[in-house]
Amino acid sequence: MRDFIYRVIIPPQAIDMHGHMNNVYYFTLMQEAAFAHSAAVGDTVEAQYKRGEIWLIRKNEAKDIKSAKLMDKIEIYTYTQAEGKATSCRYFEFKKDGELIATGKTEFVYIDLKTNRPKAIPAEIIALYS
């Protein structure tokens, strides 16, 4: 597994009535970081549909440790790890100036589009993220 780093500046639409980043926005950033990482290794949504296999989210979680604010520069470190035959987890660490401010985890299931059922993750897909 190798880390991928996604960088973002917290925009105005992410800020809640308390003046810090809304916790729901973590999921938006997790999705953006995941898509960027997948694109970087060649596992785009288009590539998934072409081979007839996709990733679907089973569970999403985030833990806020320290609030992010408007215009904060955040680095999101993410990596994947196979957790079973047809499941993989993506882990996230949100950092500001090197300090951990949040963590996240997304559990994915690998789905065969023909059967709409879970399928064992092919070795070549695991290798893309290793």
What do the PLM-derived regions correspond to, one by one?
Residues M1-R58, D112-S130:
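Hot-dog-fold acyl-thioester-processing enzymes
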Residues Y26-L29, Y91, E107:
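Residue-level recognition of specific faces of alpha-helices
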Residues H37-S88, I101-A102, V109:
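Hydrophobic beta-strand-centered segment that forms part of the acyl-chain substrate-binding groove
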Residues E93-K95:
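Core beta-strand residues in small-molecule sensory/regulatory alpha/beta domains
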Residues A102-G104, A120:
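A structural microfeature
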